Amino acid sequence: MDPLGAAKTQWPWRRCLAALLFQLLVAVCFFSYLRVSRDDATGSPRPGLMAVEPVTGAPGGSSRQDTTPTRHTLLILLWTWPFHIPVALSRCSEMAPGTADCHITADRKVYPQADAVIVHHWDIMSNPKSRLPPSPRPQGQRWIWFSLEPPPNCQHLEALDGYFNLTMSYRSDSDIFTPYGWLEPWSGQPAHPPLNLSAKTELVAWAVSNWKPDSARVHYYQSLQAHLKVDVYGRSHKPLPKGTMMETLSRYKFYLAFENSLHPDYITEKLWRNALEAWAVPVVLGPSRSNYERFLPPDPFIHVDDFQSPKDLARYLQELDKDHARYLSYFRWRETLQPRSFSWALDFCKACWKLQQESRYQMVRSIAAWFT
């Protein structure tokens, strides 16, 4: 009886000891979890990834290494400069305040550490398989196919099947939409002076560098100029020095923004820069009017499809030339909107922002099937 009675009196102390040990184990696990969570929240660099200072446009494409430990920032490699011409780059946070930065460089030595590689199609299309980044691809690295050229200027797309994760182009259905231009609201009062009609001393201009006699735009021009004088600039025509281009075009009331290729969303600097930045009313030949109106109000431009013939268009332009009120109606949109044009630096920052928002890893099965 005594041994059993003694055991009963010792049992509560054993239960207390077991409870204390259990609480100690829970506390150790909890504080270990807090430490891991805090480390994750600070964004410690992934092992093997060196932070590289953003390129500020150094012609050699090299980047200075920052030895100060920093929060991991996405590293984007430009496999080539666009058309093999170095361009000035800017901090993405400066281009759009409140956004995050990426490290962007054209230094191929960082290829093994790069989170993404932007491949400009024109620079690799002559022999894609030999000009693409090497295999094996670093784990998790995303490749971005980039082109601002229309399908006829993008050869050998079929050779790229299964290589790319994201598309980046002027097409609005691209993963990364990089148009040639756009309209955006004024942040305050319009910052431009009213249009000076007295400075518009000429009627119609057209600047063309790629003259193809059998193209749709040349055929239309030839029919139009039979009824209306058009000043043509470019190769084999009137010289137009780059330094005086906008000054020259701003003297004209109308500008022929004729695209060299007719494809959806292919609306280039011919409209956004040559016409709108010169304060000339664009006369457009390209995709349908409805396609233009996805990016512009209906009144800033004149579409050739609105007329039965080039002769009818010529007559309309001559009428507007004499009717100042009707001509000025093509500028009302400027009271609330302003035109913007693309830059390579901004396009690369758009890729930066997309990569930060979209972590899903996908594969584009066929660039050719989508783009052509």
Swiss-Prot record:
GO terms for cellular component: Golgi cisterna membrane. The lineage of its organism: Eukaryota, Metazoa, Chordata, Craniata, Vertebrata. It comes from Pongo pygmaeus (Bornean orangutan). Its EC number is 2.4.1.65, 2.4.1.152, 2.4.1.-. Belongs to the glycosyltransferase 10 family. Catalyzes the transfer of L-fucose, from a guanosine diphosphate-beta-L-fucose, to both the subterminal N-acetyl glucosamine (GlcNAc) of type 1 chain (beta-D-Gal-(1->3)-beta-D-GlcNAc) glycolipids and oligosaccharides via an alpha(1,4) linkage, and the subterminal glucose (Glc) or GlcNAc of type 2 chain (beta-D-Gal-(1->4)-beta-D-GlcNAc) oligosaccharides via an alpha(1,3) linkage, independently of the presence of terminal alpha-L-fucosyl-(1,2) moieties on the terminal galactose of these acceptors and participates in the blood groups Lewis determination and expression of Lewis a (Le(a)), lewis b (Le(b)), Lewis x/SSEA-1 (Le(x)) and lewis y (Le(y)) antigens. The chain crosses the membrane at residues 16-34. Residues 40-68 are annotated as: Disordered. It is found in: Golgi apparatus, Golgi stack membrane. GO terms for molecular function: 3-galactosyl-N-acetylglucosaminide 4-alpha-L-fucosyltransferase activity; 4-galactosyl-N-acetylglucosaminide 3-alpha-L-fucosyltransferase activity. One of its GO terms (biological process) is protein O-linked glycosylation. Glycosylated. Glycans are attached at N165, N196. InterPro entries: Glyco_tran_10_C, Glyco_tran_10_N, Glyco_trans_10, GT10-like_C_sf. Residues 35-372 are lumenal. Residues 1-15 are cytoplasmic. Pathway: Protein modification; protein glycosylation. It holds the Pfam family Glyco_transf_10. This is 3-galactosyl-N-acetylglucosaminide 4-alpha-L-fucosyltransferase FUT3.
